[in-house]
């Protein structure tokens, strides 16, 4: 009888944490993009559109001027500080979201969805981390401007180009934040079933990302 109860409890744990992971993609991605969008909306940039995994506006001429280091021309299209703020607003929104999830776990209850969203929202730093690592240890790496012209594109890189703050410093802060909040959230995985909960949550996240990127997102915000 006890074995049946244990199996049932394990199954319930797996189901709860899988279900929590199912909301991770939309709730982990959209606040980040809305952060970008709201700042750009306040700036009044042309042709601004919010998409399910990004924000677009008529930025080609702005960045062409930046690549030429013609900042005076770029500033006539949009204020450099404003574009830098819009690029920083996404990560800042993510930090606020993660802190809100942590606060919810601590003061309300450790709902699996809160834990899943907090972890998923920070997964975006992976690409930036790879670039920052190469920037630190490869002296032959092109400049940030050249790297962006060659296709590198993430928030911290654009902020670095417009403000002069080094990419490794921005990414380093994000990694410290991830390590601190990630370690703190581990306490909310159920004791004795942490592996079951973690694996189920990750599977739910994967399903969430596939569904959001492939179906829900394009339908909601093409």
Please state what every model-predicted region is:
Residues 1-11:
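Short, Lys/Arg-rich, polar N-terminal cytosolic tail immediately upstream
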Residues 14-18, 104, 175, 179-183, ...:
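Alpha-helical hydrophobic membrane-insertion segments
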Residues 18-23, 83, 87:
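Hydrophobic alpha-helical segments, chiefly the membrane-spanning helices
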Residues 20-79:
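Small-residue-rich helix-interface/hinge motifs
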Residues 37, 41-49, 102, 106, ...:
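Transmembrane helix-loop junctions in multipass membrane proteins, especially transporters and channels
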Residues 64-186, 208:
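Metalloprotease/metallohydrolase-associated module, dominated by Zn2+-dependent proteases
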Residues 111-115, 190-203:
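Membrane-interfacial entry segments at the cytosolic side of transmembrane helices
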Residues 210-222:
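Juxtamembrane boundary at the C-terminal end of a transmembrane helix
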């Amino acid at each position: 009888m006890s074995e049946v109860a244990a199996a049932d409890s394990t199954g319930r744990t797996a189901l709860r944490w899988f279900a929590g992971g199912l909301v991770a993609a939309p709730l982990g991605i959209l606040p980040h993009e809305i952060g970008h969008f709201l700042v750009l909306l306040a700036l009044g940039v042309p042709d601004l559109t919010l998409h399910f995994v990004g924000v677009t506006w008529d930025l080609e001429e702005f960045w062409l001027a930046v690549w030429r280091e013609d900042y005076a021309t770029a500033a006539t299209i949009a204020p450099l500080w404003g574009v830098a703020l819009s690029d920083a607003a996404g990560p800042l929104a993510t930090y606020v979201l993660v802190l809100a999830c942590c606060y919810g776990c601590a003061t309300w209850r450790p709902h699996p969805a809160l834990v899943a969203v907090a972890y998923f929202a920070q997964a975006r730093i992976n690409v930036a981390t790879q670039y920052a690592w190469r920037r630190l240890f490869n002296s032959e790496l092109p400049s940030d401007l050249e790297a962006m012209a060659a296709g590198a594109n993430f928030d911290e890189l654009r902020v670095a180009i417009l403000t002069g703050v080094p990419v490794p410093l921005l990414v380093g802060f994000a990694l410290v934040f991830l390590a601190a909040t990630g370690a703190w959230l581990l306490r909310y995985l159920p004791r004795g079933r942490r592996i079951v909960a973690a694996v189920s949550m990750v599977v739910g996240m994967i399903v969430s990302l596939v569904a959001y990127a492939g179906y829900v997102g394009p339908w909601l915000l093409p």
